[in-house]
C-alpha cells in the first residue's frame, strides 16, 4: 500500500441500525476508488461511514430492461449446458435436480422516511426470496435445516457438484431469479437469513449491501475465492461497497466479462 495517501472523511452521518433500533456511527474499510484490486491481497483502503455508500441514482426501467435482456439471452445460450447439468445431477446422486433456498434480497425501505421503524419477518434487512441453484450437495447436507457454512473440500459436495461449483454452472438457474426481479446479473451475493443475521451482528456495515439488488456475480466474486472465514466476508463486503460506489451499466458489463474466465478457468469464487 506504499504511495497510498489516507483520504479524510469530511463528515460523519449517524446511522440507525435496522436490527436493534439503536443509533450508531459504524465505519467500514473499503477500497480506495481507482486503486488496483487484487485477489488475495488487501486493497488500498480508506475509512468511511455507511452514508457514503448510497447507490447512485439510475433509471430503474433502463436497469431492469438491461438485466431482462441479458438474462434472457444468457438463458437461451446456456440452455444446452443447463440440460446436461440437470441430467448429471439427476443420475449421479439421490435427490432433486434443483436446490431451492431462501435468501435475503433488496431492502426497499432504506430511503423512506419511516424505514427505520419498519420491521420485516425475522427482522431481516431485505425482502426474502427463493433462490434457484443446481443441487451440488447431498440431500442430507444440513441437519434439521440448519445453515452450515460451506468450506473448502467440503465432503457434503457430490462429485458432479464439485465440478458445477468450480465452474459456477450451479448458479445458472438464477437467471430465472433475474427474470422474476429478485436479482440482477451483477450485485452483492445474497445470503441465507440465519447467516445474514449473524453477519449483521459481527459486521456493522453488512446490511448496507441490501441497498442494491443482489446479483449472480459481482466485483467481490471475480476478485476473491470462496469465503471460509469472517475476515474473508469482511473483504468481500469491502469489494461490494466499492461496486456500489461506481455502479453503472458499463461497470456491470465489465464484471460480466471478468466472470467468463472465472467460470472457464475456475478461479475466484462465489
Predicted regions, residues:
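N-terminal hydrophobic signal-anchor/signal peptide
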Residues: 1-76, 97, 243-245, 270
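A hydrophobic, helix-centered structural microdomain
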Residues: 54-140, 249, 254-270
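Short Ser/Thr-interspersed hydrophobic loop/turn segments at strand-loop and sheet-helix junctions
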Residues: 88, 223-224
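Flexible acidic/glycine-rich loop/turn elements at helix↔coil and beta-strand↔loop transitions
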Residues: 93, 229-231
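A short, structured surface patch at a secondary-structure boundary
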Residues: 137-138, 150-213, 256-263
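A short, polar/charged loop-to-alpha-helix boundary motif
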Residues: 140-148
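Long, intrinsically disordered, low-complexity Ser/Thr/Pro-rich regulatory/activation regions
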Residues: 212-221
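Acyl/amide activation-and-transfer machinery of modular secondary-metabolite enzymes
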Residues: 233-241
Amino acid at each position: 500500500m506504499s504511495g497510498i495517501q489516507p483520504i479524510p472523511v469530511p463528515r460523519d452521518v449517524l446511522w440507525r441500525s435496522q436490527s436493534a433500533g439503536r443509533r450508531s456511527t459504524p465505519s467500514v474499510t473499503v477500497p480506495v476508488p481507482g486503486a488496483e484490486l487484487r485477489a488475495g491481497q488487501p486493497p488500498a483502503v480508506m475509512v468511511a461511514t455507511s452514508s457514503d455508500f448510497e447507490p447512485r441514482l439510475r433509471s430503474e426501467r433502463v436497469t431492469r430492461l438491461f438485466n431482462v435482456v441479458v438474462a434472457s439471452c444468457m438463458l437461451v445460450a446456456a440452455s444446452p449446458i443447463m440440460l446436461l447439468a440437470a441430467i448429471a445431477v439427476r443420475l449421479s446422486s439421490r435427490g432433486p435436480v434443483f436446490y431451492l433456498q431462501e435468501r435475503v434480497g433488496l431492502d426497499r425501505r432504506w430511503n423512506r422516511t419511516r424505514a427505520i421503524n419498519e420491521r420485516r419477518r425475522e427482522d431481516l434487512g431485505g425482502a426474502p426470496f427463493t433462490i434457484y441453484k443446481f443441487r451440488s450437495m447431498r440431500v442430507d447436507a444440513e441437519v434439521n435445516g440448519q445453515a452450515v457454512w460451506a468450506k473448502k473440500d467440503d465432503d457434503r459436495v457430490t462429485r458432479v457438484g464439485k465440478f458445477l461449483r468450480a465452474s459456477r454452472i450451479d448458479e445458472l438457474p438464477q437467471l430465472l431469479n433475474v427474470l422474476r426481479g429478485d436479482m440482477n446479473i451483477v450485485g452483492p451475493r445474497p445470503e441465507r437469513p440465519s447467516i445474514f443475521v449473524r453477519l449483521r451482528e459481527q459486521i456493522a456495515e453488512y446490511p448496507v449491501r441490501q441497498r442494491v439488488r443482489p446479483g449472480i456475480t459481482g466485483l467481490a466474486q471475480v476478485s476473491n475465492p470462496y469465503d471460509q472465514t469472517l475476515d474473508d466476508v469482511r473483504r468481500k463486503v469491502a469489494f461490494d461497497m466499492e461496486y456500489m460506489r461506481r455502479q453503472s451499466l458499463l461497470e456491470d458489463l465489465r464484471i460480466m466479462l471478468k466472470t467468463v474466465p472465472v467460470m472457464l478457468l475456475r478461479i475466484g469464487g462465489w
